[in-house]
């Protein structure tokens, strides 16, 4: 009984911490858009608006626009030629640059309506058509989380960087498929067999123009994957080698380099603390943090509030969980676990268990013409032979409890060992989300070629087909979202990554970077 009460207390604390952090991030995004809306509306009221073309001033068919937005990708920034672009791939609960242009009528959200009402009260009534006719003044770019950068602005360090917006909780497989079509263009094809097995639509959103349509062997790309994003790139790489995209003659040489930043290369014991069953790595405990997450995601997607999903989308649109599609009875089936991604196991957490990582890794190769570099993070140290958090204040509050718990991880004696040679002590060092051993290089079920690096100069010249890995002192989210937390470390890390991509990872000769002479 006492253990059960302690478990409930731990669940309450974990849920509260994660909810507070999520609310902080979300409210920051909303505040940014309120500021944009206020500034735009202020300009409208201070001067007479110029006449607008009919196409700009025309009222929008919101229903039709919403339907199109569900089916189509965002207007792309198209790259071509040299040097190869650097693609930053976010991790679990992450987001990219999901941009849509919207007018005041489309943004009939609570904050904009309240703002408009307040201004009419202060300045007097203004005809609605006059307000709409000035859409160029009040239009702004409604982005994922108000334009908040998952990579904390690192994408601004180079002119040729792409930040795709992939499903934040969808499976590694589905995210890899989305990533391909984001770059190459076309309608996302999740694969016939996979779609049937998991019970979702085969085809997803449409990218009428890819963000890098010339992508091929002669025009490869650099990938930087944070957390689960690293494993997404590895699965995509194998799909390219297997020519798994109909109509495209792909190969493993389409990827020039992969940098794994706190990458989930071998799974994590945190999944078991969050609620995955250690016995199989697929099922969830009846009462756990992930069950709360599951319920929240289902309700969020079922409600299907357009402006809210524009701010943040878990990526399950191909499961068609909207109330408009399934009704109230469909919600009951989803909550009871009869249908949906949580019923089929086609979501990201099973892929992040040690068992799930072994299943993925057994099909993934390290390719001889691709450069690999991995940054493994840890926020632990040894004290009298015991692994403990290396600091209290230096760990993000959302991660501190998990750092402490993961230090004390012990595999249950009644559960089969996940792989031959498994030892608990190997999995004690961690960064609050992933075990440090998991982030070094692919090592289970078999070890891939690797080399430990103390200083970046130790690995020059780089050799392809080898995982160079480095261990740095940091928690799992030090180098994302909030740049100020990392301080000078942020610039040192990303400058090193981008410089390696531009000057040390190439097959023929160093690429010519705009406004820079190759050295």
Walk through the language-model features, giving the residues of each.
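Flexible, membrane-associating and regulatory peripheral segments of lipid-active enzymes
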Residues: 1-214, 495, 499-519
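Helical cap/lid subdomain of alpha/beta-hydrolase-fold lipid enzymes
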Residues: 2-20, 25-57, 63, 248-519
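Short coil/turn segments at beta-strand junctions that form active-site/ligand-binding loops
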Residues: 83-84, 218-220, 368-370
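Glycine-rich His-Gly loop
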Residues: 89-92, 226-227, 263, 377
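Active-site catalytic pocket residues across diverse enzymes, especially alpha/beta-hydrolases
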Residues: 183, 240-244
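Alpha/beta-hydrolase fold nucleophile elbow
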Residues: 212-226, 255
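Gly/Ala-rich beta-loop-alpha elbow adjacent to hydrolase catalytic centers
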Residues: 225-229, 233
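Active-site signature of alpha/beta-hydrolase-fold catalytic machinery across serine-
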Residues: 234-240
